[in-house]
Structure formats: C-alpha cells, structure tokens
Amino acid sequence: MLSFQHVLKALLGHELGGLDFRLTDAAIDSRLVSESGLFIALHGDRTDGHLYVDDAFAKGASLALIDHPIKSAYPILDLNSVELQIPDKPPFSLLTDNSLLALQKLAAYWRSRFDIKVIGITGSVGKSSTKELTANVLSKRLVTLKNAGNMNNEIGLPLTLLKLTDEHEVAVLEMGFYVPGEIKLLCDIAHPQIGIITNVGTVHAERAGSIEVIAEGKSE
C-alpha cells in the first residue's frame, strides 16, 4: 500500500526516515477522500482544490499535495526547504512546485514498483468499450486493474495507477487524446508494453488541428 515515505521517494528521490503512515487512496475531490487517504489540490476551471484542503482533512485525509501556500489549521511541509522538518503526525500538507506534476510523478514511481503487464488503449472512438471488453476477458484469469469510467487523462490515469496493489497481475488503461504530446505523457507514466489503437477519426480535431496530427498523436 502507498505510504508517506513512498511519496517522499517519488517527489524527492529518497526517503527521509522517521514518520511513516499508509495512504489508503488518492482523490482530487475533498468530498470523495477516504479515511487516511491522499488529497491532491488541483487548480480547476471553476474552483481551486487548495480551498478545500482542510475539508479533506476533516473528512479523514492524512496527507495533501499543494503547490502554493494556503491558510490551514494543519502543518505544511515545504519540499523545497533546506531543512525538512517532518510534522510529528498526520494530517499535514506537502508544498510542491506543481501539484499535478507531483501526482504524475507519484503515479509513475508507484507504477515502476510493480512488474506487471500494462495494456494501453486509445482511439478516436471505441476505446472505452475496448477497454471494458479487454479487462472483462482478462479478469476471468488475472487480477485486473482498469480505469473507472472515463478516467483516461493526465489526472484520471495517475489516480488509477495509484490503486495498484501486489495482487494485480495486469492493468488495462484507456488513454485519451486531445492535444499532441498527451499520449506520450500518459505512456511515460504508465509504461505500457502493449498498445491498442482502435481507429483514427476527426474527433477532437478542433483541438488537435487535423486528422494527420491526431494520427501522429495516437501513435505516440
């Protein structure tokens, strides 16, 4: 199970020793945080997760990732500080340079700890149904992790990977594409050994620019 020291290893490159505690789950919505979970404060179009850090702690979260100073009733550990003074006990926040990048780094680190097959699925249409079908077939014989719903982007895929446990034998991950470079980012995080492209169409052409750009992006 993910722990505080794992988070430090992912973000700093090393553990600090001393205090450690398990993190049961990860969430970006303070209303959905689990007891002893990890809350990642992200900047959204309508609101800012940093406004709800203390709400997440009140719900039972043990740790939060933030990327700018906030008013909080709980300690804040600045990871850029020369002398890191870890609080005596949770809950508290970790101040990072970018909370989204911190989530992605943590997910990539956590994925690297597991020697399992990862299947990445993308395509203009049909990727969700292909993911569900593939996961359903594999789950008959193997303990399978898959994205829930459409958690297939730079936020949802990392959150999915943080659910990996020693019991999982394969992961089936849907990967969404909106702009060039996005599939590469998701692959750098998940490191799939098998890739499936369902098809290439003009979906999201208004963002990508052309079907040629979409085809190139899907091939990343």
Where would I find each of the regions flagged by the language model?
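Phosphate-binding loop of NTP-binding sites
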Residues: L8, L95, L101-E220
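Short, basic phosphate-binding NTP loop
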Residues: L2-G120, S129-K140, L162
